[in-house]
Protein backbone atom coordinates (compact mmCIF):
# COMPACT_ATOMS: atom_id res chain seq x y z
CA UNK A 1 0.00 0.00 0.00
CA UNK A 2 1.65 3.20 -1.19
CA UNK A 3 0.02 5.45 1.43
CA UNK A 4 1.42 3.29 4.24
CA UNK A 5 4.94 3.65 2.88
CA UNK A 6 4.56 7.42 2.51
CA UNK A 7 3.49 7.67 6.15
CA UNK A 8 6.39 5.47 7.28
CA UNK A 9 8.86 7.49 5.23
CA UNK A 10 7.55 10.68 6.87
CA UNK A 11 8.03 9.14 10.32
CA UNK A 12 4.30 8.90 11.03
CA UNK A 13 2.48 5.97 12.57
CA UNK A 14 0.09 4.28 10.14
CA UNK A 15 -3.50 4.93 11.20
CA UNK A 16 -6.74 4.60 9.26
CA UNK A 17 -7.55 8.36 9.45
CA UNK A 18 -4.07 9.25 8.13
CA UNK A 19 -4.38 6.78 5.26
CA UNK A 20 -7.88 8.02 4.37
CA UNK A 21 -6.89 11.71 4.44
CA UNK A 22 -3.82 10.98 2.31
CA UNK A 23 -5.98 9.07 -0.20
CA UNK A 24 -8.40 12.02 -0.46
CA UNK A 25 -5.51 14.41 -1.14
CA UNK A 26 -4.01 12.08 -3.75
CA UNK A 27 -7.28 11.36 -5.55
CA UNK A 28 -8.69 14.89 -5.62
CA UNK A 29 -8.83 16.69 -8.97
CA UNK A 30 -8.55 19.94 -6.98
CA UNK A 31 -5.00 20.03 -5.66
CA UNK A 32 -5.81 22.63 -2.99
CA UNK A 33 -8.25 21.36 -0.37
CA UNK A 34 -9.42 22.94 2.86
CA UNK A 35 -9.79 20.78 5.95
CA UNK A 36 -13.55 21.12 5.52
CA UNK A 37 -13.36 19.85 1.92
CA UNK A 38 -11.30 16.84 3.05
CA UNK A 39 -13.84 16.18 5.81
CA UNK A 40 -16.74 16.42 3.35
CA UNK A 41 -15.02 14.01 0.94
CA UNK A 42 -14.48 11.55 3.78
CA UNK A 43 -18.15 11.73 4.76
CA UNK A 44 -19.23 11.24 1.14
CA UNK A 45 -17.09 8.10 0.92
CA UNK A 46 -18.66 6.72 4.09
CA UNK A 47 -15.68 7.25 6.39
CA UNK A 48 -16.32 8.10 10.03
CA UNK A 49 -13.55 10.63 10.70
CA UNK A 50 -14.25 13.79 12.69
CA UNK A 51 -13.39 17.31 11.55
CA UNK A 52 -11.01 17.77 14.51
CA UNK A 53 -9.18 14.61 13.43
CA UNK A 54 -8.88 15.94 9.87
CA UNK A 55 -7.34 19.19 11.17
CA UNK A 56 -4.95 17.26 13.41
CA UNK A 57 -3.89 14.89 10.60
CA UNK A 58 -3.32 17.77 8.15
CA UNK A 59 -1.22 19.62 10.74
CA UNK A 60 0.83 16.45 11.31
CA UNK A 61 1.25 16.02 7.55
CA UNK A 62 2.44 19.61 7.28
CA UNK A 63 4.99 19.14 10.08
CA UNK A 64 6.22 15.94 8.38
CA UNK A 65 6.54 17.68 5.00
CA UNK A 66 3.83 15.63 3.26
CA UNK A 67 1.64 18.67 2.56
CA UNK A 68 2.07 22.40 2.18
CA UNK A 69 -0.38 24.83 3.75
CA UNK A 70 -1.34 27.98 1.90
CA UNK A 71 -3.19 30.88 3.48
CA UNK A 72 -4.85 32.74 0.65
CA UNK A 73 -6.99 35.89 0.68
CA UNK A 74 -9.96 35.56 3.00
CA UNK A 75 -7.96 33.82 5.69
CA UNK A 76 -8.82 30.22 4.83
CA UNK A 77 -6.11 27.59 4.70
CA UNK A 78 -5.82 25.05 1.93
CA UNK A 79 -3.51 22.08 1.75
CA UNK A 80 -1.76 20.43 -1.17
CA UNK A 81 0.53 17.45 -1.38
CA UNK A 82 4.19 18.44 -1.43
CA UNK A 83 5.39 17.51 -4.89
CA UNK A 84 8.86 18.98 -4.57
CA UNK A 85 8.37 21.21 -7.61
CA UNK A 86 7.99 24.94 -7.08
CA UNK A 87 4.94 26.65 -8.54
CA UNK A 88 2.97 29.84 -8.03
CA UNK A 89 -0.77 30.42 -7.75
CA UNK A 90 -3.62 32.32 -9.40
CA UNK A 91 -6.42 32.76 -6.85
CA UNK A 92 -9.99 33.78 -7.69
CA UNK A 93 -11.28 36.28 -5.12
CA UNK A 94 -14.90 35.37 -5.89
CA UNK A 95 -15.04 31.56 -5.82
CA UNK A 96 -11.67 30.73 -4.23
CA UNK A 97 -10.49 28.61 -7.16
CA UNK A 98 -6.72 28.13 -7.19
CA UNK A 99 -4.74 27.46 -10.34
CA UNK A 100 -1.05 26.58 -10.33
CA UNK A 101 1.44 27.93 -12.83
CA UNK A 102 5.17 27.97 -13.49
CA UNK A 103 6.83 30.82 -15.35
CA UNK A 104 10.59 30.63 -15.77
CA UNK A 105 10.87 34.35 -16.59
CA UNK A 106 9.24 35.27 -13.27
CA UNK A 107 11.54 32.83 -11.46
CA UNK A 108 14.62 34.36 -13.09
CA UNK A 109 13.52 37.92 -12.26
CA UNK A 110 12.95 37.06 -8.60
CA UNK A 111 16.42 35.49 -8.35
CA UNK A 112 17.98 38.52 -10.05
CA UNK A 113 16.21 40.93 -7.69
CA UNK A 114 17.41 38.98 -4.66
CA UNK A 115 20.98 38.83 -5.99
CA UNK A 116 21.00 42.56 -6.77
CA UNK A 117 20.07 43.24 -3.14
CA UNK A 118 22.73 40.73 -1.94
CA UNK A 119 19.89 38.70 -0.49
CA UNK A 120 20.21 34.93 -0.21
CA UNK A 121 16.77 33.72 -1.27
CA UNK A 122 15.70 30.54 0.52
CA UNK A 123 12.09 30.43 -0.65
CA UNK A 124 9.36 32.58 -2.12
CA UNK A 125 5.66 32.52 -2.85
CA UNK A 126 3.75 34.37 -5.53
CA UNK A 127 -0.02 34.52 -5.38
CA UNK A 128 -1.86 36.53 -8.03
CA UNK A 129 -5.39 37.48 -7.01
CA UNK A 130 -8.10 38.19 -9.54
CA UNK A 131 -11.36 36.90 -11.00
CA UNK A 132 -11.34 33.58 -12.86
CA UNK A 133 -13.06 33.17 -16.26
CA UNK A 134 -16.03 31.33 -14.70
CA UNK A 135 -16.75 34.23 -12.32
CA UNK A 136 -16.27 37.08 -14.82
Swiss-Prot record:
Homodimer. Residues 1-83 are annotated as: DNA-binding. Belongs to the Fur family. Disulfide bonds: none annotated. Zn(2+) binds at residues 32, 80, 89, 92, 95, 100. The keyword DNA-binding applies. PANTHER family: FERRIC UPTAKE REGULATION PROTEIN (PTHR33202:SF2), ZINC UPTAKE REGULATION PROTEIN (PTHR33202). GO terms for molecular function: DNA-binding transcription factor activity; transcription cis-regulatory region binding; zinc ion binding. NCBIfam families: PRK09462.1. Gene3D superfamilies: 3.30.1490.190, Winged helix-like DNA-binding domain superfamily/Winged helix DNA-binding domain. The lineage of its organism: Bacteria, Pseudomonadati, Pseudomonadota, Gammaproteobacteria, Legionellales. GO terms for biological process: negative regulation of DNA-templated transcription; negative regulation of siderophore biosynthetic process. Acts as a global negative controlling element, employing Fe(2+) as a cofactor to bind the operator of the repressed genes. Keywords: Cytoplasm, DNA-binding, Iron, Metal-binding, Repressor, Transcription, Transcription regulation, Zinc. This is Ferric uptake regulation protein. Fe cation binds at residues 86, 88, 107, 124. Its main location: cytoplasm. It comes from the Bacteria.
